[in-house]
Structures are given as C-alpha cells and as structure tokens.
C-alpha cells in the first residue's frame, strides 16, 4: 500500500494553483494587450516636444500610418496620460499632446469640397465624369454647390450656370450635398428678395441627396464690395434671410472668414463654416482650434459654433489632390446625420 505524504500533497496542490493563477493572469494580460493593439488608432500624431519623442531622438511628429498605438490611459498627479507604443518603444504622453485623425468611416473629420461654375470654366473639371472621379479618388464625403448669388458691385441676382453638372455627379455617387448663395444684401428689402430667390430655387431643385443645410455665403472683398462697410450690421441683415428660410423648414449654415465671424457674427444663433487657410499643401491632421495664431482659436464661444472649416483655397497636395480648389474639413458627428 502506497503511503501518501499529506503535507507534500498539500504543498504540491498549492504550488499547482499558484502556477495556474499565474498562467491565467498572464494569458489575460496577453489577451488585453492583443485587444488593445487591435483597437489602437493608427491615425495618431504626437507633438515633438514630449519626453517620449525626445527619448527616441525624434525631431518631427510621428506621422499617421507609422504604427502608433494608444494602449491605455493612466492618471498621474491628477493629469491624464496616454500609454503610447511606437514600434518597440512604449512611453507616457500627456493627453493634450496627442491628436487623433482617422480617415476611416469612423473618422473624427471628413473632407468636403465646394464648387461653382468657375471650376468648370477654368478647366478644373471639364465633364461630370471628371468631377465624379475626383470625388471618388479623394474620398470626398460632402459637397457644397453654388446656387447663385448677388453681384458684389451692382447687386444683381445671378444663378450658377453649371450647378446641375455638380449636382448630378453627387446624385449619381450618392454623396450628400447642399447649395450655397453668395449674399450681398445691403438692407432688409434685398435680404427678403434673396430669401425668396433661394426658396424658389430649392422648390425647383428637389433631389434625393440634397440633404445638407443651405449655406448663406458672406464674402469679404476688402474694399471692393457694396457690403464691405456694413459688416457690423450684416448679422442683422442676414437674420432676415435665415428667419424666412427657417419658417419654411430650411436649415441654414453661415459661411464667413474666421476673423469676420468672430468680430461681427459671433452673437448669431447659427452654426458656422469658417474660412481660415493654413498655407500648407496638406490636409490638416488637427482641428481648427489647434492653430493658435488665428483669432478664434481661444474663443470657446466661437469654436463651439464651428462645424466646418475651409482650410485651403488652392487644394492640398495630399491623397492625390492636385486640383486648385477649395477644400474643407467637417466635424463628422455634425454631418453624418445628413447621410
């Protein structure tokens, strides 16, 4: 009969369970790491003045697509940090030094193009098919098309001669689009006239993909326009237009340059599409608020109203974009409801 040493058996069982628990913990950690990696965002940029970057002797930002991963978050001394993995290096980076830019369907920002007859007459797009190819090749998610406007010197109403070509391209590709009207009203009577023109235009151009808010385009011509001295009153004048459109169930968006928006239009109960050009031949990887040199960056009231940002008037040499045309970023969370 075999004698069993109960003491040794107990020790063996305890050791076995300790090893088992350790293996379970290790497998859990590995699983968590794998899961973290799978969920990591490759569209990450880290400022080059962080300790993590300096430790790797980097002189530039880590660019999108360089296999940068956010593993998890850590709070240290009441400050939030991201645990970042870059190749074989892992380090902590302050939350405010990490920026996300994802070009996937879950992107924080989406590309938008705006066009007019000038884009046809200048030879940028000679056919509808050429414009369709541009939209597809560059992953343009939204489009604004000029419906017409009022002349900035004589004040005559005009319509865009080529809007149908751009409209039909968006309809064919099922890309949500909207129209814009260049406002130059100098009084309430002209504002009412413009509102009536817009309503009639929309009545005659009801299409399935015309889903975006109608844009009132406030251009600044620097001393050349009949409205240049009226900027302190322009908000009041265009309110006559937007109120009439709203009463007809038309949602509106205001386009203006960032400085004029902040100086003269900030108190309007409106969302804004602002023009502020970066001067860089690339698609921005940060939102407008990160550009500290522009006037509205630190104005929380202004920034809370901006949902679209025209960052270039000459195109951006990225993503095969070689056309010299207006390009904008929009906040996806604000625009995806129009799909």
Can you annotate each of these PLM segments?
Residues 2-20:
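N-terminal Sec-pathway targeting helices
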Residues 33-81, 85:
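Beta-loop motif signature
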Residues 100-150:
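Boundary/entry segment of secreted carbohydrate-active catalytic domains
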Residues 129-139, 160-175, 198-209, 296-303:
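Acidic (Asp/Glu)-rich catalytic clusters
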Residues 202-232:
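Active-site groove signature of glycoside hydrolases
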Residues 105-123, 273-339:
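Functionally critical loop-and-helix segments that line ligand-binding/catalytic clefts
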Residues 110-114, 141-146, 176-181, 210-218, ...:
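Structural recognition of the beta-strand scaffold that forms the well-ordered cores
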Residues 35-39, 85-105:
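Boundary regions of SH3-family modules and the immediately adjacent low-complexity/disordered segments
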């Amino acid at each position: 009969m075999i004698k069993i040493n109960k003491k040794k058996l107990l020790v063996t069982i305890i050791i076995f369970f300790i090893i088992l628990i350790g293996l379970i913990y290790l497998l859990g950690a590995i699983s968590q790491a794998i899961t973290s990696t799978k969920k990591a965002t490759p569209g990450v940029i880290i400022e080059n003045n962080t300790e993590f970057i300096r430790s790797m002797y980097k002189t530039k930002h880590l660019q999108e697509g360089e296999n940068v991963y956010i593993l998890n978050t850590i709070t240290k001394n009441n400050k939030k940090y991201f645990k970042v993995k870059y190749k074989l290096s892992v380090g902590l980076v302050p939350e405010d030094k990490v920026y996300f830019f994802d070009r996937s369907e879950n992107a924080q920002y989406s590309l938008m193009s705006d066009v007019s007859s000038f884009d046809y007459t200048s030879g940028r797009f000679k056919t509808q098919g050429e414009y369709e190819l541009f939209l597809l090749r560059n992953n343009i998610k939204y489009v604004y098309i000029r419906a017409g406007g009022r002349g900035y010197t004589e004040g005559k109403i005009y319509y865009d001669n080529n809007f149908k070509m751009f409209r039909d391209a968006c309809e064919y590709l099922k890309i949500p689009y909207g129209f814009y009207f260049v406002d130059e009203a100098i009084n309430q009577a002209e504002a009412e006239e413009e509102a009536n023109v817009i309503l009639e235009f929309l009545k005659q151009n009801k299409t399935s993909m015309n889903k975006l808010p109608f844009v009132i385009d406030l251009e600044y011509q620097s001393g050349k326009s009949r409205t240049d001295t009226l900027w302190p009153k322009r908000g009041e004048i265009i309110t006559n237009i937007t109120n009439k459109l709203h009463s007809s169930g038309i949602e509106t968006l205001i386009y203006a340059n960032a400085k004029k928006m902040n100086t003269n239009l900030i108190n309007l109960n409106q969302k804004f599409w602002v023009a502020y050009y970066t001067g860089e031949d690339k698609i921005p990887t940060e939102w407008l608020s990160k550009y500290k040199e522009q006037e509205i960056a630190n104005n929380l009231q202004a920034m809370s109203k901006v949902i679209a940002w025209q960052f270039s008037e000459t195109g951006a040499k990225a993503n095969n974009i070689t056309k010299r045309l207006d390009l904008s970023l929009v906040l996806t969370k604000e625009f995806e409801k129009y799909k």
